[in-house]
Amino acid sequence: MPTPSMEDYIEQIYILIEEKGYARVSDIAEALSVHPSSVTKMVQKLDKDEYLVYEKYRGLVLTAKGKKIGKRLVYRHELLEQFMRIIGVDEENIYHDVEGIEHHLSWNAIDRIGDLVQYFQEDPKRIETLRNIQKRNEQAEE
């Protein structure tokens, strides 16, 4: 199992490859706000653990294992962002909140959150009911 830090790198590499067709050390460093030397060390570790193949000065490619995990990590992140929007978290807090919790949830919890997101999406009236409850609670706090 990858560590939370490894997950961040795999997720970002997956996103870069999906968007640009490639992922360079400099692109990864910029996206994660870390030094290129840190990226190189992590990429070497990910290569050793067979999440990707890295050739110095030639770039990197995710292995089947890396692609599978990368896809699942992106799904987890996007699902948690959807969940935060549904439950009414302020947009400016969503990314930071998701980054704070995504590594601490089991895949079972992620699957159950997915069920809940689906439940709300299948009937928009459910979201409307939730918003009404939130408004009532906010008014009661005033």
Swiss-Prot record:
GO terms, biological process: intracellular manganese ion homeostasis
Domain HTH dtxR-type: 1-63
Intracellular or extracellular location(s): Cytoplasm
Keyword list, A-Z: Activator, Cytoplasm, DNA-binding, Manganese, Metal-binding, Repressor, Transcription, Transcription regulation
Binding locations of Mn(2+) 1: 8, 99, 102-103
Origin superkingdom: Bacteria
InterPro entries named in the record: DtxR_MntR_Metal-Reg (IPR050536), Fe_dep_repressor (IPR001367), Fe_dep_repressor_sf (IPR036421), HTH_DTXR (IPR022687), HTH_tscrpt_reg_MntR (IPR022897), Iron_dep_repressor (IPR022689), WH-like_DNA-bd_sf (IPR036388), WH_DNA-bd_sf (IPR036390)
GO cellular component: cytoplasm
One function term, GO molecular function aspect: DNA-binding transcription factor activity
Pfam family, one: Fe_dep_repress
Record-listed Mn(2+) 2 binding positions: 11, 77, 99, 102
Coiled coil: none
Known regulation of activity: DNA binding is strongly activated by Mn(2+).
Function of the protein: Central regulator of manganese homeostasis.
Subunit record text: Homodimer.
Family from the record: Belongs to the DtxR/MntR family.
PANTHER family, per database record: IRON (METAL) DEPENDENT REPRESSOR, DTXR FAMILY, TRANSCRIPTIONAL REGULATOR MNTR
Record protein name field: HTH-type transcriptional regulator MntR
Organism: Geobacillus sp. (strain WCH70)
